Structure formats: C-alpha cells, structure tokens
Regions:
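Short, charged beta-turn/beta-strand-edge "cap" motif at the junction between a beta-strand
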Residues: 118-120, 126, 180-189
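Glycine-rich active-site loops that engage anionic ligands at enzyme catalytic sites
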Residues: 106-167
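A short, acidic, flexible beta-alpha connecting loop/helix-capping segment that sits on the rim
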Residues: 168-172, 184-187
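Short, well-ordered loop/turn sites that connect or cap secondary structure elements
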Residues: 106, 114, 172-175, 179
Length: 192
C-alpha cells in the first residue's frame, strides 16, 4: 500500500491517576512510551473486563501512546451537539493527527513515521470506555445547554476513537510535524 501523509495537530501528556492531559509543543518518546505520560511503561496491569488476562496480571504495554484523527474529534463533537470541538487532550489522547481518512480503522502493524525520525507502530483500536463517556457527560454540554447522557460519547465515537500502540524508534516530535503512515500489507518474506 502506498503511504498516506498527515500532520500532527496537537500533543498531550497525562499525569498518573487523571484523565486530564496537558497540551505540549513537543513530545519526547522513549522506548517505553511518552516521557511524563501516565501510560508510559514496558508493562501494565491487565484490566478486568477488556483484557485476555485476569485483572491485575502484569502484561506487555500495548498502550504506550494514543492517537485520534483531528477530523474525527470534530465529527464526534458535532454529533454530540457541543459548542466547540473536543481536543485530543479532552478525551485523554496523546496525539491528534489530521489528513488521514479512516484513521481509526488502520490495522495492527501500521507504521507512523514522523519527519524527525520517531517511529510508532499501531497495536490496536482504542475503544471508547464508560469512564471517559461519564467524564465527557460531567464536563460538557450541548449548544442548547442540554446535558449529555452517560453513554453519548461511547455511541458517537464507537468507530472513530483512535488507536494505541508502541514506540519503535524514540525521539522528539513537534506540533506541525508531518507523519507518513504506511500499512504493512505483506510480510517481508512474502514480498517479491
């Protein structure tokens, strides 16, 4: 497959124990994730309901970073009837990337290569969770001042919540930096 090019619109780092993320002009990626972010680490504890392992089991961390399409955030915000578009940090996501249609549908193994040399690999889709949906309902309202329901965010973002993955090549990325996105169609050993 040919490469698709996008642009990093915004970047965020989240403190441990909080859904809130702080906007940054640059993000430093290490082999174990984004420096200063709560999801940094080579391993993480398994979640009770969504992981294959029993809750609390130490497992490989496939969530060293998270990303969402800038355009998808705007569409979700419009569907929810919000007065302004949600930002990646509002939904606890590290990276907002523009210019890539169907971003959330990129498969495992897709490689994101930033102009400065940082390389990230997609591990899986980042499904919307009830905790984030409740957070959005508690902190945002519709243009007409009507409250949001507990599961409105889940419904609006169920196919466009973004992706999570791991770091392949560390370094620093800056807002406005270009990113080349390439899906791995065939394993190297099958290519002619």
């Amino acid at each position: 497959m040919r490469a698709v090019h996008g642009t990093l619109v915004s970047g965020y780092v989240g403190a441990p124990g909080s859904l809130k993320k702080t906007e940054c002009d640059t993000l430093e990626f290490a082999f174990d994730g984004i420096v200063g972010d709560r999801h940094r680490g080579f391993t993480r504890a398994a979640w009770d309901l969504t992981d294959k392992q029993p809750g609390g089991t130490e497992r490989r961390n496939e969530r060293q970073w998270s990303a969402v399409a800038h355009e998808d955030l705007a569409a979700v915000s419009k569907q929810l009837g919000l007065p302004a578009a949600l930002r990646a940090g509002d939904v606890a996501v590290n990276l907002s990337i523009s210019g890539v249609s169907e971003f959330s549908r990129l498969p495992r193994g897709t490689v994101l290569t930033f102009e400065g040399g940082v390389v990230l690999i997609v591990e899986e889709y980042n499904p919307p969770c009830s905790r984030m949906s409740q957070h959005i309902a508690d902190h945002y309202h519709r243009v007409n001042e009507e409250p949001l329901g507990q599961s409105d965010f889940i419904e609006a973002s169920k196919f466009c919540r973004g992706l999570v993955g791991a770091v392949e090549v560390p370094g620093i990325v800056s807002i406005g930096e270009g990113v080349m996105i390439k899906q791995e169609v065939l394993p190297k050993w099958l290519r002619a």
